[in-house]
Amino acid sequence: MDAVLEPFPADRLFPGSSFLDLGDLNESDFLNNAHFPEHLDHFTENMEDFSNDLFSSFFDDPVLDEKSPLLDMELDSPTPGIQAEHSYSLSGDSAPQSPLVPIKMEDTTQDAEHGAWALGHKLCSIMVKQEQSPELPVDPLAAPSAMAAAAAMATTPLLGLSPLSRLPIPHQAPGEMTQLPVIKAEPLEVNQFLKVTPEDLVQMPPTPPSSHGSDSDGSQSPRSLPPSSPVRPMARSSTAISTSPLLTAPHKLQGTSGPLLLTEEEKRTLIAEGYPIPTKLPLTKAEEKALKRVRRKIKNKISAQESRRKKKEYVECLEKKVETFTSENNELWKKVETLENANRTLLQQLQKLQTLVTNKISRPYKMAATQTGTCLMVAALCFVLVLGSLVPCLPEFSSGSQTVKEDPLAADGVYTASQMPSRSLLFYDDGAGLWEDGRSTLLPMEPPDGWEINPGGPAEQRPRDHLQHDHLDSTHETTKYLSEAWPKDGGNGTSPDFSHSKEWFHDRDLGPNTTIKLS
């Protein structure tokens, strides 16, 4: 990557404006192209000017002031880049997988107020000041002690040390300088912009030797991370890369000389991977490559732990929802059973009420139906009777009724003419044959002279005038009783001269003790 990038020109190290373009910087250009004077005083002044320009460039950058991507992160979420690159998740409360001693939370509360570790996770430059240390004399024998102090830092946590005692003294030759420079951190100027509480500090488990991080997250150099603006208050999650004390600030790796401060997690990971711990600047290619790999693994571990934490929270939320829904379901089942029991009870009561209503209403209804049928039958009978009285009688019946009415009168007229002391019956012999006249057979006529006939004399022995007179009388009686609608010659068309067997009339005296015999 260093071969691809163009060499950084020397005139860009100290630009005329207050804005310093950090996009074109890389580690090799910064370490190789930076030229400093030989004298210490001039070196101190140039370092102060450079640090001031570098420190002010972060505040004068309008892009970072207006919108910083690191300021838009939530408290409980990692950086967007890490969240997008790492989607795997394990258990959020996984214990450290390394047998090394984990970092304790109690060690971080001592220096939290001084903002010592805020320099590493705020990605801002610090002002360095060269001072002469009268307490440390120039001695060639100080080199072994400095190396011993650097080796002790690999196993001793640095969180409990003060900002001045935390920084090792670099080893320099006696001919170069008479007194060793001391880097002094000014926490007062940093704390006015950076305020980190002890709760924001995170304790991460050490990286296991077998862990292999993703190359996608470590493809970028630590210097290429966008710096954050310290003007705005930082209220972000301590698990994010930009706010994590587990990674060294990128600007600390860009120095040309001086001690190299690494975090405890970086040192532990380097030891677990078998890499030597770099203690001073500049870094070699191998050290830079190893440090990049370690930082990439740390970021992957942070992302994985954040994913596991979120997954655990999500699962816990789902479990709570399941419990809530289960309890609600049980309550609803109880309500359903209660409603079903109430429904059965109501159905039984309804059946009983229907039975009672049917028993009470059926009897009067049947009686009313019977009475109605009876009334209808009586009305129909009355109607038939009235209608029958209004129908006119047929002519046959009317003539018959007239005959019935007039027959007694005619009979009275006939019987009044009789002067016989007793009643006599007229009859004819059954074997005598046909009647002489059809009309005469309807009403037998008696001779006007009397009811008595000559005894012992047949009909042919009577005189001829008597027969004619009888025929006229019968015709007169027939026309008197019959209607004019009948033809005069008779409906049967029988002639009055029709001959028939002779009839025998018997005239007998009817006494009180006599009986009538028919022959």
Curated annotation (Swiss-Prot):
Alphabetized UniProt keyword annotations: Activator, Developmental protein, DNA-binding, Endoplasmic reticulum, Glycoprotein, Host-virus interaction, Isopeptide bond, Membrane, Nucleus, Osteogenesis imperfecta, Signal-anchor, Transcription, Transcription regulation, Transmembrane, Transmembrane helix, Ubl conjugation, Unfolded protein response
Region listing for Required for transcriptional activation, in residue ranges: 1-60
Effect of L426V: Abolishes proteolytic cleavage by MBTPS1
Stored Gene3D superfamilies: 1.20.5.170
Job description of the protein: (Microbial infection) May play a role in limiting virus spread by inhibiting proliferation of virus-infected cells. Upon infection with diverse DNA and RNA viruses, inhibits cell-cycle progression by binding to promoters and activating transcription of genes encoding cell-cycle inhibitors, such as p21/CDKN1A.
UniProt disease link: Osteogenesis imperfecta 16: An autosomal recessive form of osteogenesis imperfecta, a disorder of bone formation characterized by low bone mass, bone fragility and susceptibility to fractures after minimal trauma. Disease severity ranges from very mild forms without fractures to intrauterine fractures and perinatal lethality. Extraskeletal manifestations, which affect a variable number of patients, are dentinogenesis imperfecta, hearing loss, and blue sclerae. OI16 is a severe form.
Biased composition (Basic and acidic residues): 499-510
Family: Belongs to the bZIP family. ATF subfamily.
Pfam families, per the entry: bZIP_1
Region entry Leucine-zipper, spans: 332-353
Residue numbers marked as site, Cleavage: L426, F427
Motif placement: MBTPS1 recognition: 423-426
Expression by tissue: Expressed in several tissues, with highest levels in pancreas and prostate. Expressed at relatively lower levels in brain.
PANTHER family reported in the protein's UniProt record: CYCLIC AMP RESPONSE ELEMENT-BINDING PROTEIN A, CYCLIC AMP-RESPONSIVE ELEMENT-BINDING PROTEIN 3-LIKE PROTEIN 1
Region Basic motif, annotated ranges: 292-321
Name of this protein: Cyclic AMP-responsive element-binding protein 3-like protein 1
Short sequence motif named MBTPS2 recognition, residue ranges: 392-395
GO BP: endoplasmic reticulum unfolded protein response; extracellular matrix constituent secretion; negative regulation of DNA-templated transcription; negative regulation of endoplasmic reticulum stress-induced intrinsic apoptotic signaling pathway; negative regulation of fibroblast growth factor receptor signaling pathway; negative regulation of gene expression; negative regulation of sprouting angiogenesis; osteoblast differentiation
